[in-house]
Regions:
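A late C-terminal transmembrane helix in Major Facilitator Superfamily
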Residues: 303-339, 347
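C-terminal transmembrane helical hairpin of 12-TM major facilitator-type secondary transporters
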Residues: 249-296
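Symmetry-related core transmembrane helices of the 12-TM Major Facilitator Superfamily/SLC fold
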Residues: 147-163, 342-359
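Helix-breaking motifs and short loop linkers at transmembrane-helix boundaries and internal kinks
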Residues: 24, 77-83, 250, 272-273
Length: 366
């Protein structure tokens, strides 16, 4: 997760202002490149169910990890926008494969062992990857040098990950009968899926442009990329803290609260005129978006216990649709208005709507 998601997927955020300056891009262009990555993520999510049910799931996971590291390194060699689009698209496919394969398999194994409480632990790896990514970025150099450094780090993490899990026996997720699927259906899952799509748009505006937002503030002597470090620092413990809340107040109640807290953070990021305010927004953003990812997938698994692979991949597809639209729309809104206020308000409205969709159905997840 640190390699494929923390670096492969989110390295673009701290490097975005330098890339905009070096390549003379508009925010719309930068948003389109982010969307290319998320289109790849969508394609990967659509293909992922077949992977989780394949006897070659270990090979697919290894290939995805290698592809993630390779496409990160290729950022150093990209010399045209079309090549950038291809690189970021392939990176998105690889990260989706990794997320769905690891999450689905982990949920299946933990449910079998009755250890579901550990089902969200691996999401902390995303925050760890963000922090490792920032260490590489602080090393300096031009954009190509930084992408090459990140590619090497991603490859190192990939090797460590495979050393730790490579000997583990990955079993294909069994396909359940149509009768089993139909008998477990209720609207709780579909409300979760729709809300998760809103979340994809809602979080990605700040997650893509927060460093660019910081760059617009009057912060002499401050490395504006530090805001992304704060996101990573808040991310790592957030999964555990929100799981603790969920254990006491219920999964759906906690998911609803997390959506609302993130909405506050997204609005604050867009309207804040001070560095301190933006740092607080980053704490709220980093402290929720990983946890919402984990809580949302857990809620979907609980709502559809007979079709975990379908639930996880459907949530990922909805999330992908939201996040691929978000950067393209918000980048154009920022170019038109000169700031990120309206884009952030739109994102917050969708997060509030996502919270409103979190309601128990006949298979309540409370």
């Amino acid at each position: 997760m640190a390699s494929a998601m923390g670096i492969g997927r989110f390295a673009y955020t701290p490097l975005l202002p330098e890339m905009v300056a070096q390549y003379n891009w508009s925010f719309a262009t930068a948003g389109d490149l982010a969307s290319a990555n998320f289109i790849g993520y969508l394609v990967g999510a659509l293909l992922a169910p077949a992977i989780t049910q394949s006897p070659f799931i270990r090979i697919w996971l290894a290939a995805s990890l290698m592809a993630s590291a390779a496409t990160t390194y290729l950022g150093a060699e990209a010399n045209s926008f079309n090549l950038w689009l291809a690189v970021r698209f392939l990176s998105g496919v690889a990260s989706a494969f990794c997320l769905v394969a690891v999450t689905t398999h982990l949920m299946f194994v933990l449910a079998k062992e009755r250890q579901e409480r550990f089902g969200n632990v691996h999401f902390a790896g995303v925050g760890l990857g963000i922090l490792i990514c920032m260490l590489a970025v602080y090393g300096g150099g031009d954009v190509s040098t930084q992408w090459a450094r990140l590619g090497a780090l991603s490859a190192g993490l990939m090797a460590v990950a495979w050393f730790l899990i490579g000997k583990h026996q990955f079993q294909p997720i069994p396909v359940v009968s149509r009768q089993s699927i139909d008998s477990g259906f209720d609207w709780t899952l579909w409300r979760l899926i729709i809300g998760y799509g809103f979340f994809g748009f809602g979080y990605v505006v700040a997650a893509t442009f927060v460093v660019a937002m910081a760059q617009r503030l009057d912060t002499p002597g401050v490395d504006v990329r530090s805001v992304w470090t704060v996101v990573g620092l808040a991310f790592v413990p957030s999964v555990y803290l929100w799981q603790w809340v969920a254990n006491r107040f219920g999964l759906l109640n906690t998911l609803k609260l997390a959506y609302l807290v993130e909405a506050v953070g997204v609005v604050l990021a867009g309207i804040s005129g001070s560095y301190a305010g933006l740092l607080l927004a980053c704490v709220l953003l980093g402290g929720t978006f990983g946890a919402i990812t984990a809580l949302g997938l857990s809620a979907a698994r609980t709502a559809a216990p007979n079709r975990v692979a379908f639930a996880v991949s459907s949530m990922t597809v909805a999330f992908s649709l939201g996040q691929l639209i978000g950067p393209a729309v918000s980048g154009r809104m920022a170019d038109a208005s000169g700031d990120f206020v309206m884009a952030s308000l739109l994102a917050a409205v969708l997060l509030v709507a996502a919270a409103g969709l979190v309601r128990p159905g006949k298979a309540a997840v409370t």
